[in-house]
């Protein structure tokens, strides 16, 4: 597993307002890293910068051998980055299966591990719902669908932006299980979360972002013990 | 106004059949042009004011191809392909630069091309009107259907148009390309983030719309003489269709085109001097009551 | 103490989603209140309901005891509720001074005048005052679109202030700013509040700021009021901590 | 003051040169300049992209011509009556159109314009149909002014033009004008400041319609007739062309745009019948190259940040 | 200098003012090239506003071609004591206001002493108003609308018309059609003409004279396609529905071709006798790929009618030079220019008033005359005795046969009567 992500000192602006201030973030292949922070801390913007939707004004996004910063989103996706946005963004009038079909493509090395059938195998509820319009799914089902849609692109790295937001605990558990399964399959995952305990459960390492800057990084176990950090950056 | 004639026609079977079929025929030709407008708007959000000029280009290309090959099929294919390619180039070189600008900019780029293409056609093909003439296969006597008259060429036109409508509907509804196109219409960014080159997608949709306009020009060539500037009236009518049907809806365009065809065919009996006014009046009413059109974002 | 602004049993649906779920809150005169909550908690919707940008499906919005729910936005503004936006909402082609003068004239219903030159002297004097209040004097003749992000946020607040509102709603006044800029703007806000004692309500994600300046805090989650109290009370409220750290896992956590 | 000065100066230069072509050019410039400025009240200052502004140009020209031909003996009375009728039309059409947003607003204005065009073509007994109002427009003397004399028509046109510019400018520089800009820049924000946005849109529509009609009246005087293409969509398109060429962000931009448009048109038609080709290319260069009008570019350069 | 109140100049800043001024100066210089013109042996300038672009471009082009041929011949023969004629054609794009502008420009700017107006009717009325004001000598060569010279309110002493007239055509058409109606028993008539003034006048006057010459006919309906309509289906079916025995149409050019193409699909011309007044013009005859035999048409222009040597030669010369056959507008402009040239030669002058005096009542020899000459009638300054005839189409050259020439004494009598009715005579 050679591919690894290295975000180096990116600044991101929306018009005049600066959202990210020199964000650095590195991860190894096969790792699950959680980007933890409160509302408005810059998690989603970091993801959009990596995915090419909000290109950084400064800094680099190294993925494997290449610098992806400034490439259009589709080139970044083809380089092997699968993006699951925070508000899910399913195609609401399309059926579940059509949503998956739109996401289908071989991976950067031509691999076609994830197909409709392998996805249905891992997420059988999608098979049951395959003909339903995505806009009529529940929040949890939509979340499953967007993850599955990203997997259909056979990515080397999965960007999961707040996959548990607004979901019932039972659904959060399902997603947790899915992530554990993906880990065993060797998938590299970068996760954005507000939910500390979810992160502790699934992530190898946790990176804390606050006010557009990375402020802390540690293993999940150690961080979960650190009351000061928790209170300072995460709790109220 | 001639309400007696209107009532008289409504109570005569042959008149009803003839006028209804006439309305259908008019509607089909309108649909052929309008579906490109609505497709391009539905996906790209761009109002292609140059569409009438594409139609004109199609008619002229068909004329030349027909003269060279003596084959109507070749003429239609050549016109469709030629105008389609032109549309792709037009999108890539010009329109794509103003996708993110306001409507005014897009309008002016198209307007510029209407002016340029009208003159270009005059330079290349001359100012005189030209007529292709009816291909021998269609030079047949009209069919009698329940006392009404229906020309075979129009049967062919209606069949082709319905086939195109079904194919287009199928392409948009059933194929992966169509699914991606519809998804891009809703959320371009997400489609792009899934690894699809949306610039290319946009160009191909624009090309497809242009191809349909070219095909319409070629299909109409046997019965409509070609002159520089012939696109204008067609453009205006196809806008009425698009607006009434709902911008972006293929099914809406189809319905509105037939509706407008019927307004024209029956209007010519009841209100022979004001059919244009009827069409614009209908557009005003629809915009006031249901500005998004009768079939807002139906099938496309 | 009667509330300056009170919300009673307010309800708003968007399609099948309940954005505001029987919310009841009150804000005493001259209070400075922070509204916090996770994304999608209904904070901005609450502001939109108060200012009449969207109409509530049920419930009341009481300003000095009078129900203003369902009135037009312009009518509500006229009663003295000013508002600044999460993303600075400005008139890009206006200078700072022009923006404020225009806001003042709009509020005073003098914009129908066609033959006098803009701005009227009185409006100009008042605009100068407001500019001074928020510290934008130096930028009076710069176009709003050319201001720095922080100054744009200040101008947005100043536009609301120009109406001389009794109630001022600020939606994330520090969004999109660096550390130092945040404190500058928050100091300005606090200074305004303490100088003029208007009823001020602000939405904020930066807890340092919330705990530093707010008199009291309201926590929303999924369109409901989760908690209300002083900063100290909120800080120690288990439910609130759980809401932020994840409900199911709060108890499981060591 | 400045307008007065410019007006006198224009008249002096014109009378000194005594050149008929110059006078013709200036008259057309005044007519189309006023037309473009009136359209820019909507597009540039209120942010309402009307595709149907020629409706008022045509309506004004026809109303005036018809009133004069059917026996109104006083020319100013006919002009005022035409303006009143145009304002009433603008009020009705505007009230319906401003309810719609964006492109639907544009389409509805276009539809109304084409409806008027269809009426003009169909109502032959009144309008003369496609051949326009025939037989010239009578020009009885008033206040010692004899509009049968081209020089006096020129003087009146020039005075009306500068007076209108002054009036429009006064309106745009008034609190009302700034309210329109607020609507253009950020209508929701204007509403949040207490501005009744719809009412201001309607007022802008009526004022623009009024001055558009005034330009139409001047045109009817100039060509001594009225023609259906005054109310055709191409004239609306040319209005857009003019304001985009000159600049929508500067008050005199549309006048400059009209001047360039007319000079370009007149010059190009001298040398080639492929006028459309040249105009199209110029338009493309402006839209894709500059992306804004000439005066907008100049102003952007001049303005300190 | 006026300020906005916050120190930002908005109106009349020096930059913009100078831009505007520069524009005016540029305009003035551009508009006055004639200032530098020399005075000796200057050419006689004739300005020709016409439609050179858009759907009616061929009207302007054939007008220009034909007039230029006459000018070239005049100049080659030495002109007027060495003074040549310069023809300046300019495009009005078919817009009346633009036509008015072009005429003013030609007169004021290019120093044209004479206007050869080659506009369609709406443009011609606009030109009329300009020359009424300037007093410039003008010959309208393309407008067929009768009122242009017949209506005393509209006509002007310095304006002439050298073109066929709707009224003349209608009288001839009515009498010709009456003969056929009587012979074949055609009682039920219908019209299908373009929905604009020419089309309406032509239809109603044709029917009036048809009924006058053959009272047994009745008009059973009318359908009005709009000008430049792409589609005539509803009109064709309307006609089929009404089942007339004969159909009259004033459609022309591309519109007529489309109508015939679309009517053919329904077998329309097998079911009704078709009287298309504007059929017999070469582009139209050529453009119809399958010209139905038996369409009755008036001559627009035919090289075989009048069947004289001079007509055939003129047509051949035109064809040789421009590689296209001449149209109706061509003969009218050729004749108009011939009138001007002869008036210039006769008077030795280029003065409009002098020339106008010579033109009134002038008779010239012409291939287009009914009897070899055409006269510019003095009373209403319009041409008479030009060749009008009706015949029947055949699918191949010469396309029309059985031409019956009109009798100008009948035309003149009916015309006088008509003017009296209108109160114009």
Where are these regions (language model features)?
Chain E
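Extracytoplasmic "Venus flytrap"
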Residues: 47-66, 90-96, 119-120, 192-201, ...
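Extracellular/periplasmic periplasmic-binding protein-like sensory domains
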Residues: 156, 263-334, 345-348, 405-424
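Beta-alpha junction/loop-to-helix N-cap segments that form part of ligand/metal-binding clefts
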Residues: 58-65, 80-150, 162, 224-233, ...
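Signal peptide-proximal N-terminal region
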Residues: 65-87, 212-215
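N-terminal secretory signal peptides
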Residues: 1-18, 22, 27-29
């Amino acid at each position: 597993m050679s591919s690894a992500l290295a975000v180096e000192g990116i600044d991101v602006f929306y018009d005049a307002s600066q959202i990210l201030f020199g964000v650095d973030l590195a991860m190894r292949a096969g790792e699950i890293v959680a980007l933890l922070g409160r509302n408005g801390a810059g998690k989603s913007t970091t993801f959009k910068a990596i995915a090419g939707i909000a290109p950084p004004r400064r800094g680099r996004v190294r993925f494997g051998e290449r610098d992806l910063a400034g490439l259009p989103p589709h080139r970044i996706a083809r380089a092997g980055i699968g993006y699951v946005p925070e508000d899910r963004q399913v195609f609401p009038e399309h059926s579940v299966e059509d949503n998956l079909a739109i996401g289908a493509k071989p991976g950067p090395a031509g691999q076609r591990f994830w197909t409709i059938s392998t996805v249905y195998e891992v997420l059988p509820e999608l098979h049951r719902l395959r003909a339903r319009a995505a806009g009529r799914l529940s929040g949890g089902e939509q979340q499953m669908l967007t993850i599955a849609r990203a997997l259909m692109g056979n990515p080397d790295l999965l960007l999961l932006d707040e996959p548990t937001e607004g979901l019932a605990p039972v659904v959060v558990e399902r997603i947790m299980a899915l992530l554990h399964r993906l880990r065993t399959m060797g998938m590299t995952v970068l996760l954005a979360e507000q939910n500390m305990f979810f992160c502790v459960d699934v992530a190898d390492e946790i990176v804390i972002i606050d006010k557009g800057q990375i402020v802390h990084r540690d293993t999940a176990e150690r961080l979960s013990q650190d009351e000061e950090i928790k209170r300072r950056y995460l709790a109220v | 106004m001639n309400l007696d004639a209107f009532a008289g026609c409504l109570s005569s079977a042959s008149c009803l059949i003839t006028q209804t079929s006439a309305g259908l025929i008019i509607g089909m030709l309108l649909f052929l042009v309008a579906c490109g407008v609505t497709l391009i708007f539905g996906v790209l959000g761009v109002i292609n004011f140059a569409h009438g000029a594409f139609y004109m280009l199609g008619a002229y290309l068909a004329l030349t191809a027909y003269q060279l090959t003596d084959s109507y099929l070749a003429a239609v294919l050549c016109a469709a392909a030629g105008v389609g390619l032109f549309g792709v180039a037009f999108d890539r070189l010009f329109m794509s630069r103003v996708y993110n600008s306001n409507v005014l900019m897009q309008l002016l780029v198209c307007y510029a091309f209407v002016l340029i293409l009208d003159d270009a056609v005059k330079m290349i093909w001359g100012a005189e009107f030209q007529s292709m003439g009816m291909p021998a296969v269609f030079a047949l006597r009209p069919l009698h259907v329940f006392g009404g008259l229906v020309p075979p060429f129009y049967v062919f036109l209606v069949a082709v148009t319905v086939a195109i409508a079904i194919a287009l509907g199928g392409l948009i509804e059933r194929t992966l390309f169509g699914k991606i196109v519809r998804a891009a219409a809703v959320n371009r960014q997400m489609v792009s983030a899934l690894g699809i080159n949306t610039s290319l997608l946009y160009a191909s949709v624009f090309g497809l719309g242009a191809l349909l306009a070219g095909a319409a020009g070629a299909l109409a060539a046997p019965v409509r003489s070609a002159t520089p500037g012939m696109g204008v009236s067609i453009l205006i009518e196809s806008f009425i269709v698009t607006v009434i049907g709902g911008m972006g809806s293929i099914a809406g365009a189809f319905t509105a085109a037939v509706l407008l065809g019927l307004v024209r065919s029956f209007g010519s009996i009841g209100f022979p001097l004001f059919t244009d006014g009827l069409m614009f009046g209908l557009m005003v009413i629809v915009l006031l009551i249901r500005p998004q059109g009768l079939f807002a974002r139906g099938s496309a | 103490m009667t509330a300056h602004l009170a919300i009673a049993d307010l309800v708003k649906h968007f399609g099948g989603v309940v954005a505001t779920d029987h919310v009841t809150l009150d804000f005493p005169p001259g209070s400075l209140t922070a509204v916090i909550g996770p994304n999608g908690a209904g904070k901005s919707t609450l502001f939109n309901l108060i200012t009449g940008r969207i109409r509530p499906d049920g419930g009341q919005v009481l300003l000095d005891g009078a129900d203003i729910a369902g009135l037009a936005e312009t009518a509500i503004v006229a009663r003295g509720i000013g508002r600044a936006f999460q993303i600075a909402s400005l008139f890009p082609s206006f200078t700072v001074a022009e923006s404020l003068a225009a806001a003042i004239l709009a509020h005073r219903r003098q914009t129908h005048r066609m033959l006098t030159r803009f701005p009227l002297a009185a409006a100009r004097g008042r605009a100068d005052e407001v500019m001074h209040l928020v510290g934008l004097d130096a930028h009076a003749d710069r176009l709003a679109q050319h201001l720095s992000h922080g100054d744009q946020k200040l101008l947005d607040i100043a536009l609301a202030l120009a109406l001389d509102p009794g109630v001022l709603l600020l939606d994330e006044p520090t969004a999109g700013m660096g550390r130092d800029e945040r404190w500058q703007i928050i100091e300005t806000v606090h200074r305004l509040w303490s100088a003029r004692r208007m009823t001020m309500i602000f939405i904020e994600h930066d807890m340092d700021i919330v705990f530093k300046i707010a008199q009291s805090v309201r926590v929303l989650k999924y369109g409901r009021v989760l908690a209300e109290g002083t900063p100290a009370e909120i800080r120690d409220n288990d439910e609130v901590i759980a809401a932020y750290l994840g409900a199911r896992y709060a108890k499981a956590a060591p | 003051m400045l307008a007065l000065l410019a007006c006198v100066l224009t008249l002096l230069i014109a009378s000194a040169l005594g050149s008929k072509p110059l006078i013709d050019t200036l008259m057309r410039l005044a007519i189309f300049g006023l037309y473009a400025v009136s359209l820019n009240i909507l597009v540039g200052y209120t942010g309402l992209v009307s595709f149907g502004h020629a409706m008022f140009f045509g309506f004004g020209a026809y109303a005036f011509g018809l009133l004069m031909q059917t026996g109104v003996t006083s020319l100013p009375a006919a002009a005022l009556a035409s303006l009143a009728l145009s304002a009433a039309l603008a009020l009705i059409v505007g009230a319906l159109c401003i309810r719609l947003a964006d492109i639907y607003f544009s389409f509805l204005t276009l539809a109304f314009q084409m409806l008027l065009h269809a009426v003009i073509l169909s109502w032959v007994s009144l309008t003369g149909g496609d051949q326009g109002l025939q037989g010239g427009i009578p020009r009885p003397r008033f206040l010692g002014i004899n509009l049968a004399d081209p020089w006096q028509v020129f003087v009146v046109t020039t005075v009306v033009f500068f007076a209108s510019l002054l009036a429009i400018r006064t309106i745009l520089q008034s609190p009302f004008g700034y309210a329109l800009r607020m609507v253009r820049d950020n209508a929701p924000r204007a509403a949040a400041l207490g501005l009744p946005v719809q009412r201001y849109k309607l007022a802008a529509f009526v004022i623009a319609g009024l001055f558009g009609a005034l330009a139409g009246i001047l045109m009817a005087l100039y060509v001594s007739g009225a023609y259906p293409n005054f109310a055709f969509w191409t004239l609306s398109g040319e209005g857009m062309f003019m304001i985009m060429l000159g600049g929508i962000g500067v008050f005199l931009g549309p006048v400059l745009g009209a001047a360039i448009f007319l000079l370009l048109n007149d010059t190009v038609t001298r040398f080639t019948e492929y006028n459309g080709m040249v105009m199209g290319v110029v338009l493309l260069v402006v839209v894709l190259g500059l992306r804004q009008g000439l005066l907008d570019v100049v102003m952007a350069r001049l303005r300190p940040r | 200098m006026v300020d906005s109140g916050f120190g930002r100049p908005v109106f009349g800043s020096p930059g913009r003012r100078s831009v505007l001024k520069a524009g005016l100066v540029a305009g003035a210089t551009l508009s006055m090239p004639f200032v530098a013109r020399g005075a000796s042996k200057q050419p006689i300038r004739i300005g020709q506003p016409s439609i050179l672009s858009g759907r009616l471009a061929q009207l302007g082009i054939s007008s220009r071609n034909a007039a230029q041929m006459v000018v070239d011949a005049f100049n080659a023969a030495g002109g007027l004591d060495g003074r040549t004629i310069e023809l300046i054609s300019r495009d009005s794009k078919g817009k009346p206001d633009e036509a008015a502008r072009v005429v003013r420009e030609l007169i004021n700017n290019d120093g044209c002493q004479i206007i050869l107006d080659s506009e369609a009717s709406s443009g011609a009325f606009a030109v009329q108003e300009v020359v009424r004001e300037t007093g410039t000598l003008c010959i309208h060569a393309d407008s067929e609308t009768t009122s242009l010279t017949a209506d005393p309110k509209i006509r002007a002493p310095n304006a002439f018309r050298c073109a066929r007239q709707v009224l003349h055509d209608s009288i001839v058409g009515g009498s010709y059609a009456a003969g056929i109606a009587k012979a074949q028993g055609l009682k039920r008539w219908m019209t299908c003409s373009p929905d604009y003034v020419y089309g309406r006048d032509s239809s109603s006057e044709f029917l009036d004279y048809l009924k006058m010459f053959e009272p047994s006919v009745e008009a059973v309906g009318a359908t009005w396609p709009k000008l430049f309509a792409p589609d005539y289906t509803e009109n064709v079916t309307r006609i089929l529905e009404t089942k007339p025995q004969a159909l009259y149409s004033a459609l022309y050019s591309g519109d007529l071709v489309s109508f015939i193409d679309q009517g053919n699909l329904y077998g329309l011309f097998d079911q009704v006798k078709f009287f298309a007044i504007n059929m017999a013009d070469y582009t139209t005859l050529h453009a119809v790929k399958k010209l139905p035999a038996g369409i009755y048409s008036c001559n627009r222009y035919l090289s075989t009618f009048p069947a004289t040597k001079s007509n055939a030669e003129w047509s051949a010369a035109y064809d040789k030079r421009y590689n296209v056959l001449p149209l109706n507008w061509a003969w009218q402009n050729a004749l108009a220019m011939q009138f001007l040239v002869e008036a210039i030669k006769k008077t030795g002058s280029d003065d409009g008033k002098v020339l106008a005096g010579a033109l009134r009542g002038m008779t010239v020899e012409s291939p287009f005359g009914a009897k070899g000459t055409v006269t510019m009638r003095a009373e209403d300054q319009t041409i008479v005795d030009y060749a009008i005839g009706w015949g029947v189409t055949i699918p191949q050259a010469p396309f029309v046969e059985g031409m019956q020439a009109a009798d100008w004494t009948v035309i003149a009598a009916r015309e006088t009567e008509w003017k009296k009715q209108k109160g114009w005579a």
